[in-house]
Amino acid sequence: MERSLDSLAGMAKSAFGAGTSAAMRQATSPKTILEYIINFFTCGGIRRRNETQYQELIETMAETLKSTMPDRGAPLPENIILDDMDGCRVEFNLPGENNEAGQVIVRVSKGDHSETREIPLASFEKICRALLFRCEFSLPQDSVILTAQGGMNLKGAVLTGANLTSENLCDADLSGANLEGAVLFMADCEGANFKGANLSGTSLGDSNFKNACLEDSIMCGATLDHANLTGANLQHASLLGCSMIECNCSGANMDHTNLSGATLIRADMSGATLQGATIMAAIMEGAVLTRANLRKASFISTNLDGADLAEANLNNTCFKDCTLTDLRTEDATMSTSTQTLFNEFYSENI
């Protein structure tokens, strides 16, 4: 019995103290020699049983929080009780009048027997908020609650049209997620993973995507005005028809990105890399591309009036039917073909 209580207490600590994939694997692995033997001869039966119990613990916690809190932003209750978890009572006692330890105390009891553990309050609250986020947006609970970096695990989530204004999505995993038409105005997505996500038509104005991964993402028609994309990875992203007015893309990796039809007026793309990028019928008036790597990029029918390409790498860059009035190219590196084009057609603007 005590070993069962110990196991459940360990699961509770792993689920609500860490919530990561590694924590889940550790909590559901066989613990004793006998369990290892049984697990082997049942082709993982012990692990499957433990994983089922782990998932039930998470789902019960989510439902309990949802039923006891008026909304996701409300303070957590000082005492959270989960009854009948495999015949046991699981109680979470938060710091307060009855708990001066500063940690969340987990008590698992059955009859006269009990086991206790302690969980850092900050981790516990972050995990509870992640469970409530999933409840609010009708997402099924996942046994992996957080990423290794401490962000929410929302991999493959369907959040079409969701209102995520000012949401904290730092270090979250939204790879493969569908956020078409969602509103992420002023959202903090620093370090988040949006690889392969659908962000078509999303409102991302004034949002923070610093060092975020947007590789292979679809962002057609999205609004990114005044967004912070410094150091972000946008390789192979589709930004067709995006509005990126005064967007900060300095140092971003935009290799092979498609920016056709995008509006990049006064966008800061200094130090960005756009090798092999396709930029057709875009508006880039006053854009800053100093020190940018534009090798083999293709500019077709694009308005670059007043753009700054000083010190940029323009080797084998294609400029066709573009507006290049008042263009700055001081100390830019150019291939012979690019230099010839400028000399022949736009010498008055160099």
Swiss-Prot record:
Changing residue 344 to A: Decreases LAMP-1 redistribution. No effect on peripheral accumulation of GFP-PipB2. Its main location: secreted. Changing residue 343 to A: Increases LAMP-1 redistribution. No effect on peripheral accumulation of GFP-PipB2. The keyword Lyase does not apply. Keywords: Host membrane, Membrane, Repeat, Secreted, Virulence. Induction: Expression of the gene is regulated by the two-component regulatory system SsrA/SsrB. It is also activated by SlyA and controlled by the two-component regulatory system PhoP/PhoQ. Expressed in host macrophages and when grown in an acidic environment. Residues 162-201, 202-241, 247-286, 287-326 form the Pentapeptide repeat domain. Changing residue 342 to A: Partial reduction in the peripheral accumulation of GFP-PipB2 and LAMP-1. One of its GO terms (cellular component) is host cell membrane. SUPFAM superfamilies: Pentapeptide repeat-like. The keyword Transit peptide does not apply. It is found in: Secreted; Host membrane. Effector proteins function to alter host cell physiology and promote bacterial survival in host tissues. Involved in the reorganization of late endosome/lysosome (LE/Lys) compartments in mammalian cells. Necessary and sufficient to link kinesin-1 onto the Salmonella-containing vacuole (SCV) membrane. Required for centrifugal extension of lysosomal glycoprotein-rich membrane tubules, known as Salmonella-induced filaments (Sifs), away from the SCV and toward the cell periphery. Required for virulence, but not for intracellular survival and replication in phagocytic cells. Interacts with the host kinesin light chain (KLC), a subunit of the kinesin-1 motor complex. Contains various tandem pentapeptide repeats in the C-terminal region. The pentapeptide motif is required to efficiently recruit kinesin-1. No position is completely conserved in these repeats, whose consensus sequence is A-[DN]-[FLM]-X-X. The C-terminal 38 amino acid residues, specifically, the C-terminal motif LFNEF, are required for peripheral localization of PipB2 and redistribution of lysosomal-associated membrane protein (LAMP). The N-terminal 225 amino acid residues are sufficient for type III translocation and association with Sifs and SCVs, but not accumulation in peripheral vesicles. This is Secreted effector protein PipB2. The gene is pipB2.
